Amino acid sequence: MAGTLDLDKGCTVEELLRGCIEAFDDSGKVRDPQLVRMFLMMHPWYIPSSQLAAKLLHIYQQSRKDNSNSLQVKTCHLVRYWISAFPAEFDLNPELAEQIKELKALLDQEGNRRHSSLIDIDSVPTYKWKRQVTQRNPVGQKKRKMSLLFDHLEPMELAEHLTYLEYRSFCKILFQDYHSFVTHGCTVDNPVLERFISLFNSVSQWVQLMILSKPTAPQRALVITHFVHVAEKLLQLQNFNTLMAVVGGLSHSSISRLKETHSHVSPETIKLWEGLTELVTATGNYGNYRRRLAACVGFRFPILGVHLKDLVALQLALPDWLDPARTRLNGAKMKQLFSILEELAMVTSLRPPVQANPDLLSLLTVSLDQYQTEDELYQLSLQREPRSKSSPTSPTSCTPPPRPPVLEEWTSAAKPKLDQALVVEHIEKMVESVFRNFDVDGDGHISQEEFQIIRGNFPYLSAFGDLDQNQDGCISREEMVSYFLRSSSVLGGRMGFVHNFQESNSLRPVACRHCKALILGIYKQGLKCRACGVNCHKQCKDRLSVECRRRAQSVSLEGSAPSPSPMHSHHHRAFSFSLPRPGRRGSRPPEIREEEVQTVEDGVFDIHL
């Protein structure tokens, strides 16, 4: 029967189930493994797994009445294949597991041990870690000691550890997460996929922050060059997903506007940058990327955002059922969905060819968990190179590659609030890693010289005195943990930037944010941050522990999103893969609105659901 099914014309669930049973012979050999795997993977798109199990139980019971021993054993072979191919489904779905146990109990009662032995539900391992966003898997040790200083990390080392972090997060995504995203058009009640998207966005933002943390144009150019080579190594690892995140950060408007910085980037680096950008551009429906991915052998990490876009497009274009009664499923759509999801599922079966250093993983995890808004990054960019600054006169005529319509950020929703226990765990492990690697004399404290090295990994760190709470000239483990926990609590896990202070006067007394004493007098007795409005005494400036959080007006995401196309005007939810949007520029202070944004930014695409 498997050979007579014409999926393009549609079929019922029962017909497809019968076809999968008949795909087995009595010995358990599968004649049509593609059909069987497709149906077992895709059936939750149409019916719950518990209903499928009930249908299998009914078929087995009916075959007993008909004395069809062949049908009985084939049904058991299908159940065995299902458990073997998708074990997580049985561990995470208690109702499904109970139904299969009911079938096995029925076989045992009949004394049919041959058939019963085919169904081994009790040996399914636990997969609850796939549903726990806070779970951390053990990692292998590097044979040599690795420097944790960003400037000392080789591009391949950083590429390998970024690959490991994203791969570990990706392995937790299940079929049900993709199905939920496509049907709802968002990540509501989908924490695993939401966390992966946040990690992708964090990599892009971290790239921008590491560049903007450098005070001079030549220093920023060196960081850009470093990340271009990291992107090159990501391509060698065939990790296109993190490659997209890094290129998105390098191509962001907060970086692309730094003309003086780009004048210090070598022509060779610019050429390499352009090639990597062209690889992940949206031109031709990501044609360059798709061709490169198809030619890959071994481990490869596809750009999840591109394939989610494909799933959403299919969901909008084709119906699940071919009749109003919802009895004949759309086999053509099922095959197309399966081809996309099978490519994603293949990633988890091939481990990346990397080893990870636990200390560096802890450091990266905490670094990437910090969050800055686009406005904050853009504001820091303006502080580095104000718009009024004349163009640099440099013999180097290099310009950055044009900003591509890449997936800079996958969702316009706010970053999900992290579990506090996870934040504490990450911070404590990171601090322990810092002391193990940067406490050179082993006295259990960080000196000012050692602190300056650490600051290379955390450019948003406050002054040394803010961490040295007892002012003894060194920082203890407890003081460093306390600083990060305090910053995470006050700022909601979002580290800020240094203040842009100027002398100010006031007709009314204001309190110093550090010492809480009043700032008296109208003749510039205090300082005020131009970005966030924080006031403090001049003598308290370097001791202020509050990070700069630039004030911004509330922005309606619905108002800033482009209008849906006419053919989908009946839908109201919008899912955006890109930032910034034209509507958000109006929320910046007046000096930012004067900035001319590159016209290519309008080329980013939105998916409207």
Curated annotation (Swiss-Prot):
The UniProt entry's GO biological process terms, in alphabetical order, are:
cellular response to calcium ion; positive regulation of GTPase activity; Ras protein signal transduction; regulation of cell growth; signal transduction
Q: Where in the cell is it found?
A: Cytoplasm, Cytosol; Cell membrane; Synapse, Synaptosome; Cell projection, Ruffle membrane
What does the entry state regarding organ or tissue expression?
Detected in platelets, neutrophils and T lymphocytes (at protein level). Expressed in brain where it is enriched in the striatum. Also expressed in the hematopoietic system. Detected in heart, brain, lung, placenta, liver, skeletal muscle and kidney.
Question: What is the membrane topology listed in the Swiss-Prot or TrEMBL record?
Answer: Peripheral membrane protein
Major location category of this protein? cytoplasm
In Pfam terms, one family for this protein is RasGEF
Q: Please state how the activity of this protein is regulated.
A: Isoform 1 and isoform 2 are differently regulated by calcium and DAG.
Q: Which residue intervals define the domain Ras-GEF in the entry?
A: 154-387
Positions with a binding annotation for Ca(2+) 2: 468, 470, 472, 474, 479
**Per its record, what are the GO molecular function terms?**
calcium ion binding; diacylglycerol binding; guanyl-nucleotide exchange factor activity; lipid binding; zinc ion binding
Listed under GO cellular component are: cytosol; neuron projection; plasma membrane; ruffle membrane; synapse
Outline the extent of the N-terminal Ras-GEF domain. Answer: 4-126
Which residues of the sequence carry a binding annotation for Ca(2+) 1?
439, 441, 443, 445, 450
**Alphabetic keyword roster:** Calcium, Cell membrane, Cell projection, Cytoplasm, Disease variant, Guanine-nucleotide releasing factor, Membrane, Metal-binding, Phosphoprotein, Repeat, Synapse, Synaptosome, Zinc, Zinc-finger
The question of whether Protein biosynthesis is a record keyword is answered with no
- In terms of superkingdom, the source organism counts as Eukaryota
**EF-hand domain segment(s):** 426-461, 455-490
Entry comment on modification after translation: Isoform 2 is palmitoylated and myristoylated.
Location of Phosphoserine modifications: 116-117, 147, 554, 576
Q: Any keyword Calcium?
A: yes
Region (Disordered) residue ranges read 382-406, 557-592
Domain remarks: The N-terminal Ras-GEF domain mediates association with F-actin.
Q: Belongs to which family? A: Belongs to the RASGRP family.
Protein purpose: Functions as a calcium- and DAG-regulated nucleotide exchange factor specifically activating Rap through the exchange of bound GDP for GTP. May also activate other GTPases such as RRAS, RRAS2, NRAS, KRAS but not HRAS. Functions in aggregation of platelets and adhesion of T-lymphocytes and neutrophils probably through inside-out integrin activation. May function in the muscarinic acetylcholine receptor M1/CHRM1 signaling pathway.
Which disease shows up in the entry for this protein?
Bleeding disorder, platelet-type, 18: A disorder characterized by increased bleeding tendency due to platelet dysfunction. Clinical features include epistaxis, hematomas, bleeding after tooth extraction, and menorrhagia.
Protein name listed in UniProt:
RAS guanyl-releasing protein 2
UniProt organism field: Homo sapiens (Human)
Q: Which gene encodes it?
A: RASGRP2
